[in-house]
Regions:
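Positively charged n-region of N-terminal signal peptides that target proteins for export
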Residues: 1-7
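Bacterial N-terminal signal peptides
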Residues: 8-19
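Short N-terminal leader segment in a subset of presequences, especially plant chloroplast
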Residues: 9-11, 32-37, 63, 68
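N-terminal "mature-domain start" segment
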Residues: 24-49, 99, 148-160
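Surface-exposed amphipathic alpha-helical segments
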Residues: 40-41, 85-88, 131-160
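Conserved polar/disulfide-associated segments of primarily extracytoplasmic proteins
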Residues: 45-127, 135-142
Length: 160
């Protein structure tokens, strides 16, 4: 569990340093499909490690990054949110308490000039963490609301 959360946190922080972008019209995994509208790019291929899958997307004009991670953790959405936000706080982030949003949970965070929001969902076997960071959280929310097509609706939030 700690390795999966560390992997997720490392990828989230690593994306802040990522400057290259590869164009992609669609991101497709076993868990979701995400169509990328104009301005959005997939900064690197979907990554898989230790059973976790992560897609990293960015919009340079909006200065916004979105990550979608699915991990094999048998936790509730609330427990996933609580543990992740606690780990982020220990790493120096300012974090909010997890807030229920339907069957999912969300939490806001910031560190120095970086602000973001994460959405946590679970289906009993897998957990997902969707994070939006950057200058325009609304741009990331719109991308997800309009373009995310989950394979399992329980694994993703119903609203952003």
């Amino acid at each position: 569990m700690q390795k999966v959360l560390t992997f997720t946190a490392t990828c989230l922080l690593g994306i802040l340093l990522c400057a290259s972008a590869a164009l992609a019209a669609e991101v497709k995994t076993d868990y979701f499909t995400l169509n990328l509208p104009s301005g959005w790019t997939q900064s690197q291929p979907v990554q898989s490690a230790q059973g976790a899958t992560m897609a990293i997307l960015q919009n340079a004009a909006e200065q916004t990054v979105v990550t979608v991670a699915v991990t094999p953790v048998p936790l509730s959405a609330k427990d996933l949110a609580t543990q992740t936000l606690t780990n982020m706080k220990a790493a120096g982030f300012t974090v909010s308490e997890p807030v229920a949003s339907g069957d999912s949970y969300m939490g806001e965070f910031s560190k120095e000039q970086v602000k973001g929001i994460s959405y946590f969902s679970a289906n009993g076997k897998l957990g997902s963490v969707i994070t939006i960071m950057g200058a325009s959280l609304d741009a990331g929310k719109k991308l997800l609301k309009d373009n995310l097509k989950p394979v399992d609706g329980k694994l993703f939030p119903t609203d952003f």
